Amino acid sequence: MSPENLNVVRWQQGQGFLLRPGHAPQSLSADGVSLPENTCLALPSDRVRNLTVPVAPEEVKHLRRALPFMLEESLLEDVSELHFAHAPLRDGLQAVGIVKRATINEWMEEMPEPLRDLPWVTEALCLPWSAGQWTLLFESGSVVVRWAEAEGARVEAVL
C-alpha cells in the first residue's frame, strides 16, 4: 500500500465513508461496497492507542508474544483483554497499535465484509505528517492529532 493518493475508508460509529483525493466523501452502504485500489480502513483514534516502541533486534522474532508484557506496566487494562499490532519503522523502532479485543469484535460484526480485509490503521495516522510538526484536524467536539511517524490520537476539543 502506497501513501501516495491513498484512499481511506473512515469507520465511525458503525458507518463507513470513502475518502478519495479530489472527491467528496462517499457514504458506504452494506450492499455493493466497491473500493478502489490503494485503500485502507481508518479506525477511530480514540479507540486505538498508537505508540513507538524501541525493540532490540534479537527481540523482534518474539515480539508478538512479548509485546503485551513489555507494555503491561504502562497500560490501565489487563493485557489479556487487548490486541497488539506492530510494524517495523526504522533503527530498531516498532509502530504499535493497541485496541480492546471487544472493540475489534464489535467492528467485525458491524462492518461490511469487504472492509475487513483492508489494511487497518488509525485515523490519526492517515493525516499528513513531517518531522518536528504536528497535524490537527478539528471536528465537531474533538480534534484528531498526529505528532509523530506512528503516533496520534483523538482528543476532546475542550482539552
Regions from the PLM with identified roles:
Residues M1-L159:
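Hydrophobic/aromatic-enriched cytosolic interaction surfaces used to assemble or bind macromolecules
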